[in-house]
Amino acid sequence: MSQVSGQCPSRCDAPHGVPSAALDPAQTMSLLPGLEVARSTHPVEASSEEGFPEEAAPSMPHDSGLRAQQALNSIDLDVPTEAVTCQPQGNPQGCTPLLPNGSSHDHLSEPGSAGHAGNGALGGSKAHRKLQTHPSLGSQAGRKSRGSARSASQVPLQAQEGKAPAVRIHRQTASPTCCLRNAQLSGTALRSLRLESQGHRELNNKTLSQSNNKKPGVAAHAAIIPALTRPKQNCHDPSLLPGTHGVGKEF
């Protein structure tokens, strides 16, 4: 009994704990196959558990199809169906309608019109609005055309045909108003010149008189100068000579 009780702890500790050195190699080999079998059984169970979801997954669409058929069967199909059509009521604010290829915003109809231009399905055929020119622009165009016609009429025929342009210088005849203006200008110029000459003469005379008053000997020379500047009428007349007044005359 003592031997059996002494060997039991060693055998019981072997599977749970580390086998002691007292165990024989035959006993250890007998324990290893049991462990390998236990390890091999776990992957089989795991693979079997993984196989169940794969089988359950395809069953779900089948169940959903059955539910859809039941829902369709429960709906009454005797209700008459009518076609529902929607017509555009108006362009909402902040939205622009779609345009067909090759069209522009000018082709859009007015807001009050019935048809609206879209992708080409709802747009109706309408006459395009003609732009009216401003009357001022029309008058300017007419003036330009008249001016071009007049200028073309004044150009010589040789120049219009592409030949060498003939240069002609036309003397403009002076109008009577221009002549009067020129005469008035010339008259005023002459008057101004005369006044200037008179002013110069007066200044010269004043300066001479002042100088004569200061210098007594200059008076004789001042009297001689105008006599020399006079035109010579009779050189033989002794009365015209200076300093011979009253010589040869009888009183």
Swiss-Prot record:
Region listing for Disordered, in residue ranges: 1-64, 84-167, 230-251
Expression sites (tissue/organ): In the embryo, highly expressed in the sclerotome. Also expressed in the notochord, neural tube, limb buds, heart, branchial arches and head mesenchyme. In the adult, highly expressed in skeletal muscle. Expressed at lower levels in most other tissues.
A GO BP entry: maintenance of protein location in cell
Subcellular location: Nucleus; Cytoplasm
Protein origin, superkingdom: Eukaryota
Main localization (coarse): nucleus
Protein name per Swiss-Prot or TrEMBL: MyoD family inhibitor
